[in-house]
From Swiss-Prot:
This is Readthrough protein P3-RTD. It comes from the Viruses. Keywords: Capsid protein, Host cell junction, Host periplasm, Virion. The lineage of its organism: Viruses, Riboviria, Orthornavirae, Pisuviricota, Pisoniviricetes. The record marks K436, T437 as: Cleavage. GO terms for cellular component: host cell periplasmic space; host cell plasmodesma; viral capsid.
Length: 673
């Protein structure tokens, strides 16, 4: 052993660092005994806390870490990731460093799922490790990631066949995956691999391409064609009282339609309004916007008009329907609304009659009423400016009572009525428009009309009167004289005044230009629509005529059919037989029958005092007192009700008779005021 004393400078100790440097500067010879296995001497860490870089031995290999991702994974995606020369998702590995060595091995892989789905989505992505590259598709769904939250899985060398060296020409392992969600984007994979490379080799530079002909011009990128679908069930609010009354219509609201483009779905609102309206019917229209370009349009329409309640507890439950007429000149069709041209229009319409023996809410389908009116339409649309749109018109909503099959209530009640199901497909790829082929009708439907003309918008008014008719059921005998039993009301539910003279119809018939002649088919298929963009749909609706109730004389037979309880206990036939047996004269028999009829008519006085008192199967009628009360002013009616509460019904009736007779009320009726 050699002992080295500590040196001092001017009596002070030399700094340790200088001492150590002095010690290292002295040469020392160390003799070691021979050993079978020599270990590399442990290098002492330098005191200056500096790190020394490790210089790899030439030809020993290297270790690298690669990070890459697999993006745009849908919830229903499936596939496999092969690790080795086939790893195309990481070119730096497969086409880069891997070509500079003879062997490699991947010692670890980390598979992370990065979620990009919303919290409302559902589903998962299962994954499976194949260490020998023998599987082509997922065979086990034990391991999986939920698409709404991130996940992570790590595999070491023993799991991924990473303990042995592999030739750079063969793959090491695979990861297979498959999702069970929707087609929307769910997220991406972030993959980290740690690789070791062994036995480097020299890679010659690839020879450059031989000179060739000048490159041809780059082709124009292929246009991405759009495909758009609108589908929905338009609705509107109506007002109805009984099946013997006409219905009233509100303004049409915006319609909520499902909008589908390139398999992506959301909701949109389409504008709707009444195309034309009069006292008998109203034709609705749905306005459809069209993006710039040329489109082949196909529309499927199923017309069915169920009505439903708007209040609890039966809200949205069907309580009847509004039937169609069988006018062959009406049907589903399209028209120009703004900045479009419509050509090659072809519309086929069908209808389905109701069976005469079928009864709904006490009414039959014995006057040509139709339950459904369907249509199929194809056309070619070209936009000519901004904000382009066309409209879909449909069979008219009939207001007359013969088409009203909604359940009867004692007062005017709001109902929701469906217009029908409409599906509109716009295909930008098609360029030839519709083919001139006749579509087969639905089973059980009658072919109504086929047309090649679009709908014209009204330009002038027409005051031609239209004769109307009311429902005649099996138990209701037809009345003589035409319109004595026609009950019509305006929108607010009140009868029109008798003095007001209003024509029955204002405006053109929008279906007047539609023809069913086959001779015009060739010309219509090859010509453009004659409509011009200057034609605009009507703005605010014009005042329309409404029919009015002039008088009502019910026959005894009609009253007895409505209310069997007014029967006096014997029929006309019973009295005729009794007269013959007693040997009476025909004059006496007729006199007694007249008395019986008077008793039946007088029975109406006990029917009640309110129009909205009860349900009577669709045949509720007002009593005589109700007709008198309707003539009172607001203040007189309030006084009548006060007298009825304080002094009784008899005094109230006396007050009513004095007011109707034009007399001043008795002072006894004013004492409590």
């Amino acid at each position: 052993n050699t002992v080295v004393g500590r040196r001092t400078i001017n009596g002070r100790r030399r700094p340790r660092r200088q001492t150590r440097r002095a010690q290292r500067s002295q040469p020392v010879v160390v003799v070691q005994t021979s050993r079978a296995t020599q270990r590399r001497p442990r290098r002492r860490r330098r005191g200056n806390n500096r790190t020394r870089g490790t210089v790899p031995t030439r030809g020993a290999g290297s270790s690298e870490t690669f990070v890459f991702s697999k993006d745009n994974l849908a919830g229903s995606s499936s596939g496999r990731i092969t690790f080795g020369p086939s790893l195309s998702d990481c070119p730096a590995f497969s086409n880069g460093i891997l070509k500079a060595y003879h062997e490699y091995k991947i010692s670890m892989v980390i598979l992370e799922f990065v979620s990009e789905a919303s919290s409302q989505n559902s589903g998962s992505i299962a994954y499976e490790l194949d260490p020998h590259c023998k599987l082509n598709s997922l065979s086990s769904t034990i391991n999986k990631f939920g698409i709404t939250k991130p996940g992570k899985a790590a595999f070491t060398a023993s799991y991924i066949n990473g303990k042995e060296w592999h030739d750079v020409a063969e793959d090491q392992f695979r990861i297979l995956y498959k999702g069970n969600g929707s087609s929307s984007i769910a997220g991406s994979f972030r993959i980290t691999i740690k690789c070791q490379f062994h036995n480097p080799k020299y890679v010659d530079e690839e020879p450059g391409p031989s000179p060739g002909p000048s490159p041809s011009p780059q082709p124009t990128p292929q246009k991405k064609y759009r495909f758009i679908v609108y589908t929905g069930v338009p609705v509107t609010r109506i007002m109805a009282q009984s099946t013997d009354d006409a219905i009233s219509l509100y303004d049409m609201p915006s319609q909520r339609f499902r909008y589908i483009e390139d398999e992506n779905m959301n909701w949109t609102n389409l504008d709707s309004r009444w195309y034309s309206q009069n006292s008998l019917k109203a034709i609705p229209m749905i306005i459809v916007p069209v993006p710039q370009g040329e489109w082949t349009v196909e529309i499927s329409m199923e017309g069915y008009q169920p009505t439903s309640s708007t209040t609890d507890p039966n809200k949205d439950k069907q309580d009847g329907l509004i039937a169609y007429n069988d006018d062959l000149s009406e049907g589903w069709n399209v028209g120009i609304y703004n900045n479009v041209e419509i050509t090659n229009n072809k519309a086929d319409n069908t209808l389905k009659y109701g069976h005469p023996d079928m009864e709904l809410n006490g009414c039959h389908f014995n006057q040509g009423q139709c339950l459904e009116r369907d249509g199929d339409l194809t056309c070619h649309i070209k936009t000519t400016g901004d904000n382009a749109s066309f409209f879909v018109g449909r069979p008219a909503v009939q207001k007359q009572s013969k088409y009203n099959y909604a359940v009867s209530y004692g007062a005017w009640t709001d109902r929701m009525m469906e217009i029908g199901m409409i599906a509109i497909a716009l295909d930008e790829q098609g360029s030839s428009g519709s083919a001139k082929t006749k579509r087969p009708k639905r089973v059980g439907h009658s072919m109504a009309v086929s047309t090649w003309e679009t709908i014209n918008l009204p330009e002038k008014e027409n005051s031609e009167e239209i004769q109307t008719s009311q429902r005649q059921d099996f138990k209701t005998p037809p009345t003589a004289g035409g319109g004595s039993d026609m009950l019509d009301v305006e929108e607010g539910g009140l009868p029109l005044s008798v003095e007001e003279e209003i024509p029955d119809f204002v405006g053109d018939n929008p279906w007047s230009n539609i023809t069913t002649e086959n001779s015009q088919e060739e010309e219509a298929m090859s010509s453009k629509s004659g409509l011009t963009p200057q034609l605009k749909p009507p703005g605010l609706p014009k005042p329309q005529p409404i029919r009015r109730l002039k008088s009502f004389d019910a026959t005894p037979d009609l009253v007895e059919a409505w209310r069997p309880d007014v029967n006096p206990g014997y029929s006309k036939a019973d009295w005729a037989v009794a007269t013959i047996i007693a040997g009476g004269s025909i004059k006496d028999g007729r006199s007694m029958i007249d008395k019986r009829d008077k008793a039946v008519l007088d029975g109406r006085k006990s029917w009640g005092s309110s129009l909205a008192s009860s349900l009577t199967g669709g045949t509720l009628k007002a009593s005589a007192k109700s007709e008198k009360l309707a003539k009172l002013t607001t203040s007189e009616r309030a006084r009548f009700e006060q007298i009825k509460r304080q002094q009784g019904s008899v005094r109230a009736s006396e007050f009513l008779e004095q007011i109707l007779a034009g007399k001043d009320p008795d002072p006894k009726f004013l004492r409590d005021r």
